[in-house]
Amino acid sequence: MDAIKKKMQMLKLDKENAIDRAEQAEADKKQAEDRCKQLEEEQQALQKKLKGTEDEVEKYSESVKDAQEKLEQAEKKATDAEADVASLNRRIQLVEEELDRAQERLATALQKLEEAEKAADESERGMKVIENRAMKDEEKMELQEMQLKEAKHIAEDSDRKYEEVARKLVILEGELERSEERAEVAESKCGDLEEELKIVTNNLKSLEAQADKYSTKEDKYEEEIKLLEEKLKEAETRAEFAERSVAKLEKTIDDLEDEVYAQKMKYKAISEELDNALNDITSL
């Protein structure tokens, strides 16, 4: 009987232990189910987060791709700009060389102009001398004309006296001879005056020819000076255009450099964000 009681107690104890174990198992089951549900929720959240991260990574990848394309375009623009700058530098060098040559030609032209002005001054002084000589020759010619007129008057008087002597040949033979001598002297002097008049006329023609020659030279010098001034003005215009082109290209280069720097900073920021996102994914 005692054995049965002990066995009943043992069975009762085993039953209580079994009930406790069952309750514990039920609690463990519920805890496991709760944990499993929590894990499933965490898994779903992780899947959503992973999907969002993948979308974000894809978005960042597209942004990086766009940034790389923009960077390549900016680098290409920078390369083209450097080529343009090199070409512009060559053009500037050519313009400077052409400007130096123009300045040399201008200096030569100014020297020639100075020489021409000196020659013109000398020519002007020569013209004044020639004019003074011409005035003196005119005065001399007027004097010779007066002398010629006087000689003609003397000749006329001689003719009249000759006629008078002819009428009074017998009485005035001696006076007739003197009148004939005076007439011969007058005729000789008249011939000399005619020769001097021819010489004066030739001198005047020579002076007129020289004056025309100097006038032609002066017109030629004026044309050369005008041509040189036009060439100088053209060279100055090309130099101003080259300076404006240089300033414009320098501004373009500065803008491109700013754009390249901005693209690099943007690419750096995107790379940092992408690295952080990848680190977050790796840590998960």
Swiss-Prot record:
GO terms for biological process: actin filament organization; muscle contraction. Residues 1-284 form a coiled coil. PROSITE patterns: TROPOMYOSIN. The modification Phosphoserine is found at residues 61, 87, 158, 206, 215, 271, 283. Residues 1-78, 117-136 are annotated as: Disordered. Signal peptide: none annotated. Its main location: cytoplasm. Keywords: Acetylation, Actin-binding, Coiled coil, Cytoplasm, Cytoskeleton, Muscle protein, Phosphoprotein. GO terms for cellular component: actin cytoskeleton; actin filament; cytoplasm. It comes from the Eukaryota. The modification Phosphotyrosine is found at residue 261. The modification N-acetylmethionine is found at residue 1. GO terms for molecular function: actin binding; actin filament binding; identical protein binding; protein heterodimerization activity; protein homodimerization activity. Binds to actin filaments in muscle and non-muscle cells. Plays a central role, in association with the troponin complex, in the calcium dependent regulation of vertebrate striated muscle contraction. Smooth muscle contraction is regulated by interaction with caldesmon. In non-muscle cells is implicated in stabilizing cytoskeleton actin filaments. The non-muscle isoform may have a role in agonist-mediated receptor internalization. PANTHER family: TROPOMYOSIN. This is Tropomyosin beta chain. It comes from Rattus norvegicus. The lineage of its organism: Eukaryota, Metazoa, Chordata, Craniata, Vertebrata.
